[in-house]
């Protein structure tokens, strides 16, 4: 890697972004699992309310380009299918 100032700055920025993105992705996985567990436990009313929260988080992550918009749409669709069963 070059030792000029701009390369060092980009390296610092990339590291900060990676840390932030990893934490958001981890949070998304956790809340998605919680929603699935609610559905499997038969708590549909709670799951429906929680699904709205999950969808909002997925849309936010897609808007900030942490995940791809199609991935967010796919995850919301699959959770919705589970809810409707």
Swiss-Prot record:
Query: Is Ribonucleoprotein one of the keywords?
Result: yes
Q: List the disulfide bonds.
A: none
Supply the InterPro entries for this chain. Answer: Ribosomal_bS20, Ribosomal_bS20_sf
The UniProt keyword set, sorted, is: Ribonucleoprotein, Ribosomal protein, RNA-binding, rRNA-binding
Which stretches are annotated as coiled coil? Answer: none
Q: Name one GO molecular function term.
A: structural constituent of ribosome
Q: Which GO terms describe its cellular component?
A: cytosol; small ribosomal subunit
Biological process GO terms, please? translation
Q: Its biological function?
A: Binds directly to 16S ribosomal RNA.
> What does the sequence similarity comment in the record state about its family?
Belongs to the bacterial ribosomal protein bS20 family.
What this protein is called in its record is Small ribosomal subunit protein bS20
Q: Which organism is it from?
A: Borrelia garinii subsp. bavariensis (strain ATCC BAA-2496 / DSM 23469 / PBi)
For this protein's source organism, the top of the classification is: Bacteria, Pseudomonadati, Spirochaetota, Spirochaetia, Spirochaetales
